[in-house]
């Protein structure tokens, strides 16, 4: 059974928590103790029905404040598919949380309040979806019950959003009119909107293709651990453990060790105490090489037929995630897979004004700012362009003074400075 990872995003009070709660409740994905807590809760909607948003409450402190201040994950499954939901906060100051939640998602659900239409947060969330190249977008126009299930309201919002989607080059966009409070078109098709002839949200989620139309097929395995037991029984054992981030590698395949450039071939593949002929994307394996070449943690084993980019100067889209602004005089740590490299922001190309999607010159980056920069590293980085291979096209920036993650980077190209 395959897994669909998706994120929900919307402005404050657009009904994300209620939508997720309705999805879990109506699909029968609630455990007995959760159901009991739900029915015994004093939290009710204005019409006296159960407040399904309770099902997505996170930490106690978050519940007491009445907001969700981190990315909350929920898991459920139907007969057709397993699902992992990332619930991102709607507040503008939590844009970084949306980046975190969307980075591992394959689909985004963007909620729009039917009474308010497209908001600045709608544009911001859609821009992030475009930036992270999520292949599918579902626009749920929520609270249709509050506008008398009006087809004209739905069509007006749809037309307004399509203009944004065209600017952002969002190609796979589906629109569903819903009422999370009443349950219309969440799991079951709505009887109140006979003019809508599409699928319910759950039916769409169960049937949408999760395999990329043109997957990146070239093998990449960052080395996380060099295994040398140093025992009498395993004196000559030398394996390289890591997770396949793209493509596949087979026994006897020729590979290159990056960044050193040494060439060798694979002699054996181990997986969970078994010997395999092939390692595919997502598998954590141990590779053995035919030649005794120098391989260290942080190096990458790549298929010889297709080499990644390798550079000390990288153009990257950039989301600043720290309360302290960017300091271009500081040497930050670039974390790319298991490798840390010293680096600095060499140039700020531009920042994006989210309200109108225009690029403008800038001299600094503050919390939740998004734009493009040039990174200069102390050692070469082995990477692919994010749009071609997201699994090998992103990194984070760490401030060595605080050990905090301060930025997310999406690699776009190598440059000569």
Named regions from a protein language model:
Residues 155, 162-324:
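Conserved catalytic-core segments of large NTP-driven translation/proteostasis enzymes
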Residues 81-83, 88-94, 102-126, 130-155:
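Conserved Switch II/interswitch segment of TRAFAC-class P-loop GTPases
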